[in-house]
């Protein structure tokens, strides 16, 4: 299951998952962050239709953080992903609607049905999975989670301490990290996986509608990074989490019980839990090294396979 706030790198994560023979994408649950949950549903349905996978169900999740009444994307996020979340690229709406059931029920039922075979990959806020833990507390011990979020050894990207996904709902991320069995794929490794315009040019040469659309939206993302950050590429944040779900040997992990700061200027910081440092059972692991060259080669192989077919 991918849990997405479907912006540009979420769309890339969908393509990567569909091109991965190790994975079967059984559903997409939607959250907020890059866009509203409503727009994440629309974008997920549209991207799946563009890629010819209208068989994959899409579920609406929570609309805002557990401690908030509403949500709107920040001005910075709108600059990164565009007003529509896809860099202004117009992908036709899918004719099919989201599923009637909600994201939380789908997560809980899927875990019961698939057991240890299921991996849940949240690439936005942790609000949906925290709600699922409340609905079925046994889920925390049973569900394998590979989370895109957090920053253990590097600075955050919304504040000096906090990474964007964790900052959306620090309480939910804290519940996930304190209770779940989680591999955290954070900025420590995702910032090492830069995709450049040499790669998007390869997608354009495929001569397909999907290849062109993905090249256009990713170039928008790369242009933002070049103008605002001064780097000639974009980090493949969400696709790397999907890659780790398929092949954990791509990263080196540090077993460490993590928590999230919930108050003060460091609110949203992911850090080792003081009381958990001496515990032998490390419930969480943080990715601290990545074989970026091997990941990027696999990313291009898998996405070209998917984009070239449509």
Whereabouts are the PLM-identified features?
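Metal-dependent C-N hydrolase catalytic cores
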Residues: 41-113, 282-291, 295-298, 304
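Hydrophobic aliphatic residue packing
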Residues: 8, 31, 58, 176, ...
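Generic "edge-of-domain/loop-turn" microfeature
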Residues: 35, 65, 152, 265-267
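Conformational coupling and interaction surfaces
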Residues: 13-17, 24-25, 167-171, 178, ...
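Active-site histidine-anchored catalytic micro-motif
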Residues: 1-4, 8-46, 54, 84, ...
